[in-house]
Amino acid sequence: MIVFDLDEDRPRRKKLTKVKRVGRSNYGRYGAARLALRREPVQMAGISFHLLFGGGAKYGSGEDSIFLHDCLKKGLKVLAVPVAIAKLHDDRPSTWFQGYNEKYYFDKGGLYAQIYGWRAPMIALYNCLRHGKGRYKEWGWKRAYGKMREGIRSVRNGRM
């Protein structure tokens, strides 16, 4: 599988500067629009996009992170290359990001539960403490963490 770069009107992502291996520590920064893959190895490994995550689903984002996580877990090789395959025009509002609100934190908790399993509460807490002065400014990290815990519980209890 190859992760390509994207040209953007208003760059928000760090540009790739060299070919590098995508691993468990950095797969979360690449979205689905950047992926190119051969279908057969993915099918043989029994991997598909999770239907409860992504635009229009119960959990509004994270389908690409779960997909890459599953690919790496099954041993598929993923490379990031500094070649742009598309140009993104940021001329319409996001279909899933409406700000750092209740739904955002709930969905993020669900994503953490799906990827990290029993470690999800610790990852959520780490994220809240790490970004506490930035994205949790309005909500406060404790309230955001509580909403993430609700999302984690909803995945664990099968109320997806």
Regions found by a protein language model. Give the residues of each.
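Short beta-strand-to-loop element that shapes/binds the nucleotide-sugar donor at the catalytic cleft/hinge
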Residues: 1-17
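Short, P/G- and charge-enriched loop/turn segments at secondary-structure junctions
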Residues: 20-27
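Conserved nucleotide-sugar donor-binding
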Residues: 31-51
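Hydrophobic residues within well-ordered alpha-helices
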Residues: 70-72
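Non-catalytic, C-terminal membrane-associated alpha-helical segments of glycosyltransferases
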Residues: 99-160
